[in-house]
Amino acid sequence: MTKIDLLVKNAHVFNVYLRKFEDVNITIKDGKFYWINKELPGIEAAKVIDLQGKYVIPGFVDAHMHIDSSMTTPKVMGQTIGKYGTTTIIADDHEITNVAGVKGLKDFIDEKAPIDIFFGIPSSVPSTNPNMETTGGLIGVKETEELLKDPRFVCLGEVMNFKDMTSDHDTLIKKIIAACRKARPTMPLEGHVPAYHSEDLAKVIYAGITTDHTQQTSSLVDEKIRSGMFVEIQLKSMHQEVIDTVIEHGYFEHVALVTDDSMPDTLLKGHLNLLVKKAIDMGMRPEDAIYISTYTPARHMGLWDRGAIAPGRVADFIVLNNLEDLSIAQVYKNGLPFAAKDEKDNNVYPEELLHSVKAPKLSEADFDLKTDLVQNGKVVANIIQINEVGTFTNHIQKCLEVKDGHVQWKKAGLALMLCQERYGKNEGRYAFALIDRGIVGDGAIGATWAHDHHNLIILGTNIAGMVSVQNLLVEEQGGYIAAKGSQIVANAPLPLGGVVSLEPMSVLGKQISKVRETMVDLGYKNTNEIMSFSTLSLLVSPTLKISDKGIFEVKTQRHIPLFEC
């Protein structure tokens, strides 16, 4: 007689190896699946659960996400997404690393969480180079080799610097890739490969990159898979043509659903389960949608012990009421019911992480946009134009009036953006940009959660409001703030590194939701307003972006002047 801890009977159980449901019984012993079969002779169970025909699938595995990009901690993230069935994540926490380096990263990830968390080694800190952006942390070969010794790190986090990756020179990122290949020859090397195709794509794969998660089209998915890449499909890539391409070509072995950046207010509704449900709604068989959110991501990351309901695998599973709406009845972690909590993070973090915003406060005079190209007349402005979908921008030009050296940007229907160095390295130096299709109403938004350098960014049409937002960001040591007119109406403090909240998700989600509502009221138009604004500073996301060192064209990394004659 074999004694086991739990017997789960009368269930439709998903077999990932056959990609179909079977009417079998499940046994669990010491937190792992033991024997799965119709008949289980000689088994003595301490506890028996009769599911009465419900469906059982493996716990979801999210192979590409960022805990700190959800502005939260590992503990709160685990509390939040565990109840949605996500039991394993691979997190590339390069936000906190850009702020505080390897030490800050270790302080951040050492906290215990109620789900299993593996990590990617942040490869792009900074995302470009110190000549283009100022960061608090730097990751080089030495730091990479240090993290390679830690078994929690199972992949190289997304490599972003296309120019250095494909350069003829022996660049830093090439050295980092070589260090990974030497220490862990089969470790996945995650990429950030937006819109690259043909020879550019070949160059990236030739450099060693195995995976891409960025915004996809059907043709890009097809080309990447045919070229040997594993493609991670996030929400913004879930267009009908992309899903149809995966289905029609049977690309299920080569793709996974991932969340990448989940906003706190979105996490109040769900996590990876929402993408699985969406894939089903778009015509994918439930069995295939489940497969690419459990088994393929686990296999891709070398996590053989999960992503399947089979002997020896970690007993993480989800009980579903039905397959039509993916309604979750119960989640189990290590064979035990997942206990959903919504608690504040009371972990004690180092003081340097709690006091990372060292920028001086600004006044209205600091926001006076001037040019020395002409005293009275016109200048040509290089303008960042926001798109309503995605994080890519357009580079446009407009002629603007100049009076007594002051640029009359408001008359052109533009918004003013400022990016200020906040690590105490350059005395709070700042650069300006002009934004088209940003805020059109009277107000301002600002954040220290500014991908990926996380300097202080402000966008607005009301100078007094911009000053109010900037001053409060400094006082509160970071956050996401919005003002109408000169009055602050929404505030999400992010005191940990200026990028992470310590509040439970129920509180943080509502705070970010209020910021988002204010942005919409001010006329900001994008399918993800928060991410759109916070990636206006992301120097690896096309086309034109800003840092504390100015405006840059992403692909060429060329500095672009704000004004030309």
UniProtKB/Swiss-Prot annotation:
Pfam families: Adenine_deam_C, Amidohydro_1. One of its GO terms (biological process) is adenine catabolic process. Signal peptide: none annotated. The keyword Hydrolase applies. InterPro entries: Adenine_deam, Adenine_deam_C, Amidohydro-rel, Metal-dep_hydrolase_composite, Metal_Hydrolase. Its EC number is 3.5.4.2. This is Adenine deaminase. The gene is ade.
